[in-house]
C-alpha cells in the first residue's frame, strides 16, 4: 500500500497539482486516506466511491467479515499468496455487458498481500480538515452489504453521503450518473 500511496503523492508533487478532488473506489479508500495524510494541502476534497473508510490501525483485511478473514489468512499461510479473482468477477461487480466484462477481466490482477495487511497512515488535524464525501452504491452482491457499513461510518463522521443505484463498478456501468455526483461534489 505504501507504494500505491507514494505513486499518488508523487504525481501530486511532480505535476504540482493543487485543489485536487481525489476519488478512490473499493481498496483505494485505503490509498486516498494515506494520500490525505501525506499531502493534505494539495487536496480540495476526498471522495470515497463505495470504498473502505479506515480508522486508526485498521487494515483492509480487518474490515472483512470474520469468516472471510480466517479463510484468506489460512490461504496465505498455506500458499503465501491470495487467490486470484474468479473468472466471473465482473458479474459479481454488477457488470452485465459482455464487452465491458471482458475488458475488466483482462485488467484484473491480484493485490500484493501487504495491501490487505498494512493500515494506511491517517495523518493529523490538517489531514482531517480535508472535506470528505462518500458515494454508496446500493446494488449488487459485492459492494452493497460491505460498503454500506462504510457509508454509515461516513454519515456518522458528518460527511455528505450520496446514494447511487448501481453495483460496485458504477463508474463503468453508470458513468453518467457517477460523473454527475462527482461534479456536484467538486462544485461544492
Residue ranges and their predicted role:
Residues 33-37, 179:
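Short, hydrophobic alpha-helix immediately C-terminal to the catalytic nucleophile
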